[in-house]
Amino acid sequence: MKYALFSVPVGTIYDLPQTIKEGEEGLVSTIGDEGLYGQACQVRTAPGGVTTAGVQLPPDVAEVVSFYGYHGYVNQRELQFVREEELWEYLGEDLVLVGRATDVLSLPKVQGVRMMELERGGVLRRQPETAEEVEAHKGWAKVLLTDGRTGYVRDVALEPVKYEMTAVF
């Protein structure tokens, strides 16, 4: 486990392995940043491991560095762990950015079952379609989720990815 993709619409990155700490005004959150669906991160220490600083992580917390260099801690249920080969394959695919909040549906029509609701900034893999599918699914884009399921989003909700997710890898 060296890499992961955020597998929830908005994942929380904490500055410490615990979610709260004692502050001047009592208990305060250790939230530092967030990772959006489909964004990549490097896993520095696996859940339950010992960090290079000698800190024992809880069994459900991973130490990560985001693709833009933010260091923190994430609950493992918010991540899809991938091998290095899988990460590079993912980054080489036709990635698209969610330009506005949108639903991922099971079918290319509003009657599809909602599989997930994504926020602006999430990343999806656009899937190739035949000419017949493009015509039949007009206005919809076929996408692949981090867990391997296929879904559909309105194509007007998608934008090209304008950044590289390999900054710290």
Describe each model-derived feature in a short phrase:
Residues 1-30, 36-96, 100-103, 107-114, ...:
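Boundary regions of SH3-family modules and the immediately adjacent low-complexity/disordered segments
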Residues 117:
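A short glycine-leucine-enriched loop at secondary-structure breakpoints
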